[in-house]
C-alpha cells in the first residue's frame, strides 16, 4: 500500500540530525547502571489479549492507519501504559489470523513515572514516553544491539519520535528479575525497551511497516486523535 505524503514529511525529520538526550544515543540509563546481576528474562508465554476497551481502540487506530496508507502489514503491537511496568503490557497481534504472537514486559521513560507511567510527552529531552499510533520502520545495530526505528503518526502527540530517536530495543533492566528486586522495571529515556532475551525476535517480526499503538487513558488525546476518529476525518487525510 502506498504511504501518503504525510508520512514522508514526518520521516524527513531525520534530516534534522541527532538530538542530545535522545533514548537511542544516551549513555546506559541510570537504572541499568544501578542494576547488579539480573535474572535472564523468563521464557515468553503467549498470555491473554489486551483488555477489551484497549484492544478496540488499538484496532480502530490500526484500521484507520491502514486505510490512510500509513500501515503496510497486518500486525499490531499494543502497549498499555495504564498497567504497571511489572506486568506484561506489550502484545504483538497477528490481525489477519486473530492471534497473539508475543506478550512481553516493556519499559517506559524515566520521567513518565515509577512503576506506573503517568506523564507523556512529544518533546525532545523530556525522557518521557509518547502515546498514539506509530509505524514500525527500519532497523539498525546500535549500542543496545538490534533496534527498531519508530515513526510517530500523530501531530503534537508523537510526531517528533524520529527527532527524539525513539526506538524499540533490548535492555537488561527489563526482566522479571529486575522487577522482583526493585518492584518495577528499569526505565528508558522514552524508548519502549524490551527484555534483551526476546527483543530481536519481536523487532524482526514487526519491522518494515506494521502498527504500534501506545495507550493511556489521556482524555485530550482520546478526544483529538485522528486515528481514533477516522470516519469524521478521513476526507481530510493528507
Language-model regions: role of each:
Residues 26-189, 197-205, 210, 214-238:
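Cell wall/extracellular polymer interaction/catalysis modules
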Residues 1-11:
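Bacterial N-terminal signal peptides that target proteins for export
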Amino acid at each position: 500500500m502506498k504511504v501518503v505524503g504525510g508520512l514522508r514529511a514526518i520521516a524527513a525529520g531525520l534530516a534534522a540530525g541527532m538530538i542530545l538526550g535522545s533514548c537511542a544515543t544516551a549513555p546506559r540509563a541510570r537504572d541499568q547502571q544501578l542494576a547488579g546481576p539480573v535474572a535472564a528474562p523468563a521464557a515468553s508465554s503467549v498470555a491473554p489479549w489486551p483488555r477489551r476497551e484497549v484492544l478496540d481502540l488499538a484496532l480502530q487506530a490500526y484500521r484507520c492507519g491502514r486505510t490512510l496508507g500509513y500501515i503496510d502489514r497486518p500486525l499490531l503491537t499494543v502497549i498499555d501504559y495504564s498497567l504497571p511496568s511489572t506486568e506484561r503490557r506489550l502484545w504483538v497481534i497477528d490481525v489477519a489470523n486473530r492471534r497473539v504472537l508475543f506478550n512481553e514486559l516493556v519499559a517506559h521513560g524515566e520521567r513518565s513515572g515509577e512503576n506506573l507511567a503517568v506523564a507523556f510527552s512529544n518533546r525532545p529531552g523530556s525522557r518521557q514516553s509518547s502515546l498514539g499510533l506509530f509505524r514500525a520502520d527500519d532497523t539498525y545495530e546500535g549500542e543496545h544491539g538490534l533496534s527498531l526505528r519508530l515513526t510517530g503518526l500523530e501531530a503534537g502527540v508523537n510526531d517528533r519520535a524520529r527527532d527524539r530517536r525513539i526506538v524499540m530495543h533490548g535492555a537488561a533492566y527489563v526482566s522479571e528479575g529486575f522487577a522482583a528486586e526493585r518492584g518495577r522495571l528499569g526505565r528508558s529515556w522514552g524508548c519502549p525497551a524490551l527484555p534483551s532475551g526476546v527483543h530481536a525476535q519481536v523487532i524482526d517480526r514487526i519491522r518494515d511497516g506494521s502498527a504500534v499503538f501506545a495507550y493511556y487513558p489521556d482524555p485530550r488525546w482520546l478526544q483529538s486523535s485522528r486515528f481514533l476518529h477516522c470516519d469524521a476525518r478521513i476526507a481530510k487525510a493528507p
